[in-house]
From Swiss-Prot:
This is Plasmid recombination enzyme. CDD domains: MobM_relaxase. Pfam families: Mob_Pre. Contains conserved positively charged amino acids probably involved in the binding of the pre protein to the RSA site. InterPro entries: Mob_Pre. The interaction of the RSA site and the PRE protein may not only serves a function in plasmid maintenance, but may also contributes to the distribution of small antibiotic resistance plasmids among Gram-positive bacteria. Belongs to the plasmid mobilization pre family. The keyword DNA-binding applies. GO terms for molecular function: DNA binding. It comes from the Bacteria. GO terms for biological process: DNA recombination. Keywords: DNA-binding, Plasmid. DNA binds at Y44, Y115.
Length: 494
């Protein structure tokens, strides 16, 4: 749970000028490095005071108008008690803008109800520093008299430290009681901020790093035993002696944390050798796989080249087949033309034979029959016989060509069918084998990657960030292997 912080500082006339300039941000440049000028417009005032009037003039006018004495205000009089109201960063991170404003208004109302609404001179809320806080000026004016000692004595300050957190809790803000203001009331603003920083450091060491909150001075042992602490404290308070168990200082917590880190570093050193061995084994395995990938890539390239050559040869044969097909069609056309010519010749021959039948045989003196031909008829007969022989010779040639064409067509059909079967078989076997090999390599690569991720996880837990980043940089050199695998897969599939 967060603490309620309420710290008071007495303000005389000489202090109010600087307080006014600081709270209203009238400086062009700030010596306070905590101020973020880009957020100063988010600051606001919870009273209806005229913000152009200085605190000193406002408070003196108020006192002079309401005092019962005619005496002038002493030059060294405490004109105002400024309260800084805040909590830790974690508390405000859980609140939105409206809830933050309600928190400060509630704190202001507590002082207004207990010390007079008219005595609240200013209530300036700052949101432009590391932690939201309120500077609230309470004029210690009561019964017509100005007296800081009368309004805020030691007992009243203790009462506020007890009562204010309770009041805030009743209004929905769960806060623990802070340190007694009487111990810190004379602190400067810088000292107060250092105290706040120490408080935040303490909470971070306890909550984030789990530093031990208590130390037993009898043994020097650090522990987390809250029950033992309060038991010893109650016993010591009863007999008015100092408890042997006290809260650890921030320095003791940091020393403990440093020791924990040193022990962790020793563990890292002891586990470094096995990790280096594992890493060496992984590097050997990666080297082996790299060689396998290169080999597969080479084989895939060879297979791709063979497939390319086979496809080129197949394309050549297909072109040759198309050429043969065209020749066969041409020969068939020529054969048809020859058949027509043959029929014409047969008709012509039939006519010539008819003429020959008209020739009548004659008998010679021996009584034998013979044909007498005129020179023209003889020459015509010779020519006809020559043409017939020539035609028969051509027909014999054409018949042989036709027989060869029939055989060629059958061979072409057989070759085409065989070629298609060979093509499918070659492609199927090569692609199936390559796919199988690629699948095997993918599985091995997946297993290797899982082992690698597991090892990197262990290294991340055990190694310092810088050493781990250096290791990652070295492992990035293995990335070209991935490119080799991708190329092998692409060449195998396409």
């Amino acid at each position: 749970m967060s603490y309620m912080v309420a710290r008071m500082q007495k303000m005389k006339a000489g202090n109010l000028g600087g307080a006014f300039k600081h709270n209203e941000r009238v400086f062009e440049t700030h010596s306070n490095k905590d101020i973020n000028p880009s957020r100063s417009h988010l600051n606001y005032e919870l009273t209806d005071r005229d913000r152009s009037v200085s605190y000193e003039k406002q408070i003196k006018d108020y006192v002079n108008e309401n005092k019962v004495s005619n005496r002038a205000i002493r030059k060294d009089a405490v004109l105002c008690d400024e309260w800084i109201i805040t909590s830790d960063k974690d508390f405000f991170e859980k609140l939105d803008e409206e809830q933050t404003r309600t928190f400060f208004e509630t704190a202001k109302n507590y002082f207004a109800e207990n010390y007079g609404e008219s005595n609240i001179a200013y209530a300036s809320v700052h949101l432009d520093e590391s932690t939201p806080h309120m500077h609230m000026g309470v004029v210690p004016f009561e019964n017509g008299k100005l007296s800081s000692k009368a309004m805020f004595d030691r007992e009243e300050l203790k009462h506020i430290q007890e009562d204010l957190p309770r009041y805030m809790s009743d209004h929905g803000f769960e806060l623990e009681r802070g340190k007694l203001n009487s111990e810190a009331k004379h602190k400067t603003v810088a000292e107060f901020k250092r105290a706040m920083a120490d408080m935040e450091l303490k909470e971070e060491l306890l909550e984030k790093y789990h530093a031990p909150p208590f130390v037993d001075e009898r043994t020097g042992e650090l522990n987390n035993d809250t029950e033992a602490f309060w038991h010893e404290k109650e016993f010591a308070d009863m007999f008015e002696v100092q408890s042997p168990i006290r809260e650890t200082t921030n320095q003791e917590k940091m020393d403990w944390l440093r020791k924990q880190y040193q022990e962790e570093l020793k563990k890292l050193e002891s586990s470094k050798k096995p990790l280096e061995d594992d890493l060496s084994h992984l590097e050997e395995l990666l080297d082996k796989k790299t060689k396998e990938y290169i080999k597969i890539d080479s084989e895939a390239s060879e297979r791709a080249s063979e497939l390319s050559k086979a496809e080129g040869y197949i394309n050549t044969l297909e072109n040759h087949s198309k050429s043969l097909e065209a020749k066969i069609e041409c020969l068939e056309s020529d054969n048809l033309q020859l058949e027509k010519q043959k029929a014409t010749k047969l008709e012509a021959k039939a006519l010539n034979e008819s003429e020959l039948r008209e020739l009548k045989p004659k008998k010679n003196f021996l009584g034998k029959e013979h044909y007498e031909l005129s020179p023209e008829q003889f020459e015509g007969l010779k020519a006809e016989v020559y043409r017939s022989r020539t035609l028969l010779h051509h027909k014999d040639i054409e018949l042989e060509q036709a027989k060869r064409q029939v055989s060629l067509r059958a061979s072409k059909n057989y070759f085409t069918a065989s070629l298609e079967r060979a093509k499918e078989k070659a492609k199927g076997e090569s692609i199936d084998r390559l796919k199988s090999e690629i699948k095997r390599l993918k599985n091995e690569n997946s297993i290797l990657r899982q082992q690698n991720d597991k090892m990197l996880g262990k290294l991340r837990e055990l190694m310092p960030d810088k050493a781990f980043k250096n290791l990652l940089s070295e492992l990035k050199a293995i990335k070209p292997i991935v490119n080799i695998i991708k190329k092998a897969i692409e060449k195998s599939l396409f």
